[in-house]
Amino acid sequence: MDETRYRDPIDRLVEPGERVLAHAKADVGQGLAPAPPPEPESTVAPGWRTVGSVLLNVLLPLATWDRGDRLVDAIGWGIAGRGAPGSAASRLHRALRPPRPDLQVRETLLAVTDRRLLVCRTGGVKLLAGREAEERALAETSVAWSATRAEIASARVGWHRLNPKRLRIDFTDGSWLSFTVPIADSGRPLREVAAALSA
């Protein structure tokens, strides 16, 4: 994996005078995630109930069971993060995993500057797209979420299950979220991000 190809898009996103100390391509850790932030109040007035809406309210809980999904995540993957609804980890997780994804492949990039932590997303690419689509997606990289350095309590890389390359970022509000890379990829970029956040 060539980490240098991500540096130019990140450099375009920082403010003038802001220095990039470390960056890494990573994925949010699999497993039990922090609770989602509270949803904003709906401004749409309630309408008439239809037979379809009543049936969906009856059948939808049978098709998906949130507690069952969370139990499978906890047993199979462990815990990917913790935090109350609206915490830093909760907002970060929601920024990277929205409730209604567009089903395109996006890369997550972590960048530590002398002022903040940037969590960036590349543009969307369809599965099995060509090299030109990947370059276009890289050019469409944008900041999905950011936090000042004062909001970061600590960061460290360590073992989780069989993967020795899991970055855990702890926030000052007590929440935390993990990021991983595939076992075949180098853990050096994650260690550099952890060192830059801890400095």
Q: Where do the PLM segments sit?
A:
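Phosphoinositide-binding peripheral membrane targeting modules
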Residues: 62-176, 183-184
